[in-house]
Amino acid sequence: MPKYRSATTTHGRNMAGARALWRATGMTDADFGKPIIAVVNSFTQFVPGHVHLRDLGRLVAAQIEATGGVAKEFNTIAVDDGIAMGHGGMLYSLPSRELIADSVEYMVNAHCADAMVCISNCDKITPGMMMAALRLNIPVIFVSGGPMEAGKTKLSDRLIKLDLVDAMIQGANPQVSDAQSEQIERAACPTCGSCSGMFTANSMNCLTEALGLALPGNGSLLATHADRRALFEEAGQRIVALTRRYYEQDDVSVLPRSIACKAAFENAMTLDIAMGGSTNTVLHLLAAAQEGEIDFTLADIDRLSRQVPHLCKVAPSTPDYHMEDVHRAGGVMGILGELDRAGLLNRGVANVLGLGLSETLARYDIMRSDDDALQRLYRAGPAGLRTVEPFAQSCRWDALDRDRQQGCIRAREHAYSQDGGLAVLSGNLAQDGCIVKTAGVDPDSLVFRGPARVFESQEEAVEAILGGRIHPGDVLVIRYEGPKGGPGMQEMLYPTAYLKSMGLGKQCALITDGRFSGGTSGLSIGHVSPEAASGGAIALVRDGDPIEIDIPVRHIRLAIAESELALRRQQELARGTQAWTPRDRRRKVSLALRAYASLATSADRGAVRDRAKLGG
């Protein structure tokens, strides 16, 4: 029988000092026999996805204490990728994931907490906490802050839905008036919550639900809706029960490594492919799997990507649907239900509810259950009012979207495409693989060939795009932006957004060892591995080199002779200590970022630390 971790600090005469300090936090004698549960919050006023979380930690804590536990709150950092975008701040985004994971480990192990409720929401916070949860392997439930309502405004007497990416594209489009650009900017992000499309934050929150670590509705129920309160309350109550099952009944099935097993990771990735999620999810799932010592690799993702259809199309891949529409169509459980009917899921998995997949879908898939409470839950919709308050409204759609032929979520036989929304490509330009979000690629661009235009920084590429120096048919190659080479693996949302604003979104390709925002669409190929700084062939590309992309056959190729490629490699190695570094880039890199770069692996390994360098 496992012993409560917290007993290390609450029992025994030699822990008198620790108990004295616990008493100073408000604990009493009666509390020293209860489980101590960490409420891991991520409130900050810097990030709209987290600005409303301040009081939600106390909401969870109150339920923990009412159910017989002791709640102790702490906060992690949270970087807003949108605000950090387009300047040196983006270098810090991905490295913050490792800091978040480490900080959770530090706090939970230093104070011997028994379990956790993780309150996350945005891009690197959910994966950072997930990495920590699988590293620590103590009972955990995730509950996110929820998605933002889609922006809405009238243009030419037509009501349109908007999100952050629309504001960026319009702002850079010289054909758009200042007045229209400002109108869209003001309407694009109307409420608190994670940005309203299937960007990285919402993708990851959907995946925690698919992994079984979050409650049904977590990925899609709006941040502003009153119904979301119940998720926080139930998380607080249920974590106490899970904690007691593990420590008092030796039930290891409640632990995160038991729930988020390889079969669950495959289900989560299957969901991701079916809904055309952010390519960043590939990085984060690979990283989390390594923390949990789960044998889940890019090869598994490649295998799944070849058999899973595209069942749910959401912004930025279409302007028609946002997360509020996904929720109306049944949310994550609705997509999983269609995947299950298609025979594409592993059914032998469980979740924090203690239910298997079949029983979960029987209860929570709107196509299988006519339960009034369930129907009411998934009719929760937007109010269209600007607010930063959670639970601020209780509007409901008149009816659910159960149209599986032409609705937001579709059955396999009516899929948007029989090829899924993500694909792994490989070839001499990316020997260890690269990722493309096929959900956002125009069908006419699935096979593409063009001359390379090489840039050694995102900033240099943006200058060329806005300066009119990029032409239809060009293949932009942005290198030395990988985990080590950046360092920090910047997102390339600005280059892709500016290509659209210049009318080149469907006429050019972009290849990088960096990554892309979940808001990216178009022929954008990222995570090229090995990265340039690790000796990858992307470092050897020269202006004018022909590059061939064939998504249907999963191939990417630098179309030059192998002898020429070998010669260029020898020439690069001849640079000595300057080999595999940018030739002409001025970028200030802090000591903190250099420390990250010294241990970073390429994207095919999740951009995690190289354990071999740490002796394990």
Curated annotation (Swiss-Prot):
PROSITE patterns hit by this protein: ILVD_EDD_1 (PS00886), ILVD_EDD_2 (PS00887)
Superkingdom as given in the UniProt entry: Bacteria
Cited SUPFAM superfamilies: IlvD/EDD N-terminal domain-like, LeuD/IlvD-like
Modified residues (N6-carboxylysine): K124
Co-factor binding comment: Binds 1 [2Fe-2S] cluster per subunit. This cluster acts as a Lewis acid cofactor.
Catalytic activity, reaction form: (2R)-2,3-dihydroxy-3-methylbutanoate = 3-methyl-2-oxobutanoate + H2O; (2R,3R)-2,3-dihydroxy-3-methylpentanoate = (S)-3-methyl-2-oxopentanoate + H2O
Keyword Amino-acid biosynthesis tagged: yes
Residues that, per the record, bind Mg(2+): D81, D123, K124, E491
Catalytic EC class: lyase
Entry EC no(s): 4.2.1.9
Cofactor: [2Fe-2S] cluster; Mg(2+)
Functional description taken from the UniProt entry: Functions in the biosynthesis of branched-chain amino acids. Catalyzes the dehydration of (2R,3R)-2,3-dihydroxy-3-methylpentanoate (2,3-dihydroxy-3-methylvalerate) into 2-oxo-3-methylpentanoate (2-oxo-3-methylvalerate) and of (2R)-2,3-dihydroxy-3-methylbutanoate (2,3-dihydroxyisovalerate) into 2-oxo-3-methylbutanoate (2-oxoisovalerate), the penultimate precursor to L-isoleucine and L-valine, respectively.
Complexes and interactors: Homodimer.
Name this protein carries in UniProt: Dihydroxy-acid dehydratase
